[in-house]
Amino acid sequence: MSDTITSASATARYVRVTPMKARRVIDLVRGKSVAEALAILKYAPQGAAEPVAKVVASAAANAENNFGLDPRTLVISEAYANEGPTMRRFQPRAQGRAFMIRKRTSHITVVVESQKEGAK
C-alpha cells in the first residue's frame, strides 16, 4: 500500500453567505477539474461564487505547495457547505413590534484529489 498523499483540502469559515446559496454554487463544480471549476465560478452570476472560487483556489494551492501535487491533475472530489453561527438582528416594525432578521453564515470546505492523466 502506498503512503503518498493524493488529496488536499481548504476551508473558509464564517463566510457571510447562506449555506443554501453556497450549496447551489458548489453543486456546479463538484467532480470537475480545478481549472474548469474556476472558469465556471468566474462567470457564475451568484454572489456565493466568489467565496467558493477562493476556497477552490486555496485547496489547489495547498495541494501544490504542501504536498507537491500537479495542479493540472487536480479534481474536486468533495465540496460542501455547512451551516455556521447565525447572527440575529432586530428590525423595528409597526406598532412597537420587532422582527428577527437572521444573517446566516456558512463553513465552505473543498477537497481536491490528484487523478491520473488518462483517468476520467
From Swiss-Prot:
Transmembrane segments: none annotated. InterPro entries: Ribosomal_uL22, Ribosomal_uL22_bac/chlpt-type, Ribosomal_uL22_bac/org-type, Ribosomal_uL22_CS, Ribosomal_uL22_sf. GO terms for biological process: translation. One of its GO terms (cellular component) is cytosolic large ribosomal subunit. It comes from the Bacteria. SUPFAM superfamilies: Ribosomal protein L22 (SSF54843). GO terms for molecular function: rRNA binding; structural constituent of ribosome. Keywords: Ribonucleoprotein, Ribosomal protein, RNA-binding, rRNA-binding. PANTHER family: CHLOROPLAST 50S RIBOSOMAL PROTEIN L22-RELATED, LARGE RIBOSOMAL SUBUNIT PROTEIN UL22M. Part of the 50S ribosomal subunit. HAMAP family: Ribosomal_uL22_B. This protein binds specifically to 23S rRNA; its binding is stimulated by other ribosomal proteins, e.g. L4, L17, and L20. It is important during the early stages of 50S assembly. It makes multiple contacts with different domains of the 23S rRNA in the assembled 50S subunit and ribosome. The globular domain of the protein is located near the polypeptide exit tunnel on the outside of the subunit, while an extended beta-hairpin is found that lines the wall of the exit tunnel in the center of the 70S ribosome. Belongs to the universal ribosomal protein uL22 family. This is Large ribosomal subunit protein uL22. It comes from Corynebacterium aurimucosum (strain ATCC 700975 / DSM 44827 / CIP 107346 / CN-1) (Corynebacterium nigricans).
